[in-house]
């Protein structure tokens, strides 16, 4: 098992958006899978929508040095994100890197 870091975004029912850099356990690859060490990722508009949503970026404050920030979602916009209340969602779905390990049948990758 490998430990990695992942950016996550969560909005509370109270309208507080939290962006965190969390440590996550990454399992060893199964048959036919590879584990990639990500070295570069783009930030797409869809990533920004999930990352920041309708939060007021001028309200940004650091909560934990280097790993957590918070912003307020304006009252008039909070209903637009009700479906994601209290879900700590991973941000981003693209990346480039090198194969770190491979499962059975994927060694050639």
Model-derived regions: residue spans:
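Glycine-rich beta-strand-centered segment in the early N-terminal region that forms part
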Residues: 27-42, 55-109
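Cytochrome P450 core scaffold surrounding the K-helix E-X-X-R motif
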Residues: 46-51
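Proline/serine/threonine-rich low-complexity linkers at boundaries of modular beta-sandwich domains
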Residues: 12-15
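Short structural boundary motif marking the start of a folded domain
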Residues: 2-7
């Amino acid at each position: 098992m490998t430990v990695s870091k992942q950016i996550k975004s969560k909005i509370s029912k109270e309208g507080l958006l939290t962006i965190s850099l969390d440590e996550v356990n990454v399992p060893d690859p199964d048959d036919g899978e590879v584990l990639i060490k990500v070295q570069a990722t783009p930030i797409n508009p869809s990533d920004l929508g999930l990352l920041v949503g309708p939060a007021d970026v001028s309200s940004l404050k650091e909560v934990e040095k280097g790993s957590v920030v918070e912003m307020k979602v304006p009252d008039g916009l909070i209903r637009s994100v009700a479906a994601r209340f209290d879900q700590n969602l991973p941000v981003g779905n693209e990346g480039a890197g090198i194969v770190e390990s491979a499962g059975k049948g994927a060694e050639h990758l």
